[in-house]
UniProtKB/Swiss-Prot annotation:
Organism, scientific name: Methylacidiphilum infernorum (isolate V4) (Methylokorus infernorum (strain V4))
Domain of life: Bacteria
Subcellular localization: Cell inner membrane
Entry EC number(s): 3.6.1.27
Ranges that cross the membrane: 39-59, 75-95, 106-126, 179-199, 214-234, 243-263
Main location, first listed in the record: membrane
Membrane topology: Multi-pass membrane protein
Protein name per the record: Undecaprenyl-diphosphatase
Keyword Transmembrane: yes
GO cellular component labels: plasma membrane
Reaction catalysed by this enzyme: di-trans,octa-cis-undecaprenyl diphosphate + H2O = di-trans,octa-cis-undecaprenyl phosphate + phosphate + H(+)
Major enzyme class: hydrolase
């Protein structure tokens, strides 16, 4: 059981930070510094655990997409999700083809954390001037949200949730509607990204993970449970609150990471 504590803690951190607009990357970097770096396969499993939580929360919405031929009113929403995902996929593959790689030090992550804080603050200030918000996702909004996922992907620390949710809010969508669209879009996006990363990691299944099945299962389950709780909380919170508190949390996280760098900590 003692050997599983690092796995449990990393699962908790992933579950808390994956869908909140606070950046899972920044938190996992710090955690893995003290708990030990984990394999890409382990990271994929805890991310999939978080995705499963969102699937369970939106199970009715997702199941309704299986019967679009019965309920045509949901077809436009499904098509907008599909187009947003396609845009994310095309732009993501283009960025990958250009040779982009994840940064190997904390500098770019810290910049992205502060950049995400500014993005949230700016969007909330602009949206505070609006007299009303819309509940429907327009085609321009769907396209913009799909593109914004790529920004979060190339700037680890920015936060996919912060990029997508706040993009929709900036374009006049209510926080609950923006969050739902962003989370539903995140399901196929994160599944696809996890599959792509897994294939790369295993070199087409020729180099299997050294993690034990117990380790992978524990990380997956812990992440799923914690993500379920945190997403449920967020969906309730945004009914009556703004995202401004996350700005100050991110600023605090950014300065904490700066302090670590000043003390000589490196990720390599």
């Amino acid at each position: 059981m003692h050997d599983l504590w690092p796995t449990i803690l990393l699962g908790i951190i992933e579950g808390l930070s994956e869908f909140l607009p606070i950046s899972s990357t920044g938190h996992l970097l710090v955690a893995e510094h003290w708990l030990g770096e984990r394999s890409e396969t382990f990271n994929i499993f805890i991310q999939l655990g978080a995705v499963l939580a969102v699937c369970l929360i939106y199970k009715e919405r997702l199941s309704s997409f299986l019967f679009l031929w019965k309920d045509r009113e949901k077809l436009p929403y499904f098509l907008k999700l599909s187009v947003a995902f396609i845009i994310t996929s095309i732009l993501g593959l283009w960025v990958k083809k250009m040779g982009w790689e994840l940064p190997k030090d904390l500098g770019p992550v810290i910049i992205a954390i502060f950049g995400g804080a500014f993005w949230i603050y700016f969007t909330e200030k602009v949206s505070s001037q609006r007299q009303s918000f819309v509940e429907e996702i327009s085609w321009p909004t769907a396209i913009a949200v799909g593109a914004s996922q790529v920004v979060a992907g190339v700037l680890p620390g920015f936060s996919r949730s912060a990029a997508t949710i706040l993009m929709a809010v900036l374009l006049g969508v209510s926080r609950p509607a923006a969050t739902e669209f962003a989370f539903l879009l995140g399901i196929p996006t994160m599944f696809a990204a996890s599959l792509f990363a897994w294939i790369e990691e295993t070199h087409f299944l020729k180099n299997p993970s050294l993690d034990s099945p117990l380790t992978l299962a524990t990380g997956f389950c812990v992440s799923a449970v914690v993500a379920f709780i945190s997403v449920k909380w967020l969906l309730s919170y945004i009914q009556t609150h703004t995202f401004i508190p996350f700005v100050w949390y991110r600023v605090g996280l950014g300065f904490f990471l700066i302090a670590l760098v000043a003390l000589g900590w490196k990720t390599q």
